[in-house]
């Protein structure tokens, strides 16, 4: 089981500093969509140049022109790139092919997918490396959790890894870990904590079952 830190609301310099502080506890560091919108792919490059061991994920949430956008993210140092599960099959397949051509991985974000079970099966067959159930900010505000979606997707896929994101914090991560996902994505639960290093450590301890 891997742990990913999602950084959304900082600039690229702040993001790199946070990543450096917690890198020993996380496997992947994400440059979130808001940072990409504000600062572009150089933010991905800046992170890549300032951390040592963790992989870098570029949360582009690709919808179209998938092979080109994946290639650009990879050029700037991304190890993993995201595409939306609601994208066309042709886009998903092109993104998978482009990522794999460079030895990189594709994460498919299931945010706003209506038929999770059917789409997860299709994406699994298309070669997605990760399928991520994602309760976004707007649904978190309504009290929604990704647990049920995680169970649904885990029950139907055969090859892809399952990731889970959405409001996960050190005090709630054990419920997620109990469902045995392959990747747990924590954003504000670490980034906005009074002590991000301690929060990251608590999350690492939880996923290692200690």
Curated annotation (Swiss-Prot):
<comment type="similarity">
    <text>Belongs to the HPS/KGPDC family. HPS subfamily.</text>
</comment>
<dbReference type="InterPro" id="IPR001754">
    <property type="entry name" value="OMPdeCOase_dom"/>
</dbReference>
<dbReference type="GO" id="GO:0019854">
    <property type="term" value="P:L-ascorbic acid catabolic process"/>
</dbReference>
<keyword id="KW-0554">One-carbon metabolism</keyword>
<dbReference type="InterPro" id="IPR011060">
    <property type="entry name" value="RibuloseP-bd_barrel"/>
</dbReference>
<dbReference type="InterPro" id="IPR017553">
    <property type="entry name" value="3-hexulose-6-phosphate_synth"/>
</dbReference>
<dbReference type="InterPro" id="IPR013785">
    <property type="entry name" value="Aldolase_TIM"/>
</dbReference>
<dbReference type="GO" id="GO:0006207">
    <property type="term" value="P:'de novo' pyrimidine nucleobase biosynthetic process"/>
</dbReference>
<keyword id="KW-0119">Carbohydrate metabolism</keyword>
<comment type="pathway">
    <text>One-carbon metabolism; formaldehyde assimilation via RuMP pathway; D-fructose 6-phosphate from D-ribulose 5-phosphate and formaldehyde: step 1/2.</text>
</comment>
<keyword id="KW-0456">Lyase</keyword>
<dbReference type="GO" id="GO:0006730">
    <property type="term" value="P:one-carbon metabolic process"/>
</dbReference>
<comment type="function">
    <text>Catalyzes the condensation of ribulose 5-phosphate with formaldehyde to form 3-hexulose 6-phosphate.</text>
</comment>
<dbReference type="InterPro" id="IPR041710">
    <property type="entry name" value="HPS/KGPDC"/>
</dbReference>
<dbReference type="GO" id="GO:0004590">
    <property type="term" value="F:orotidine-5'-phosphate decarboxylase activity"/>
</dbReference>
<dbReference type="GO" id="GO:0043801">
    <property type="term" value="F:hexulose-6-phosphate synthase activity"/>
</dbReference>
<dbReference type="Pfam" id="PF00215">
    <property type="entry name" value="OMPdecase"/>
</dbReference>
<dbReference type="GO" id="GO:0019647">
    <property type="term" value="P:formaldehyde assimilation via ribulose monophosphate cycle"/>
</dbReference>
<protein>
    <recommendedName>
        <fullName>3-hexulose-6-phosphate synthase</fullName>
        <ecNumber>4.1.2.43</ecNumber>
    </recommendedName>
</protein>
<dbReference type="GO" id="GO:0033982">
    <property type="term" value="F:3-dehydro-L-gulonate-6-phosphate decarboxylase activity"/>
</dbReference>
């Amino acid at each position: 089981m891997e742990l990913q830190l999602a950084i959304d609301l900082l600039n690229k310099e702040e993001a790199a500093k946070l990543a450096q502080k917690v890198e020993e506890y996380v496997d992947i560091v994400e440059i979130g969509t808001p940072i990409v919108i504000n600062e572009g792919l150089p933010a991905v490059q800046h992170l890549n140049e300032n951390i040592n061991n963790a992989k870098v994920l570029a949360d582009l949430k690709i919808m179209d022109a998938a092979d080109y956008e994946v290639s650009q993210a990879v050029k700037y140092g991304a190890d993993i790139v995201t595409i939306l599960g609601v994208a066309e099959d042709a886009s998903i397949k092109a993104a998978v092919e482009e990522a794999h051509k460079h030895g990189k991985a594709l994460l498919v974000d299931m945010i706003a997918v209506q038929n999770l079970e059917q789409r997860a099966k299709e994406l699994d067959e298309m070669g997605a490396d990760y399928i991520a159930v994602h309760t976004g900010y707007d649904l978190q505000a309504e009290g929604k959790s990704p647990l049920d979606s995680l169970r649904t997707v885990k029950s139907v896929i055969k090859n892809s890894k399952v990731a889970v994101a959405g409001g996960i914090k050190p005090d709630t991560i054990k419920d997620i870990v109990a469902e045995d996902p392959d990747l747990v994505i924590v954003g504000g639960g670490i980034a906005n904590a009074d002590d991000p290093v301690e929060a990251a450590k608590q999350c690492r301890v939880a996923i290692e079952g200690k």
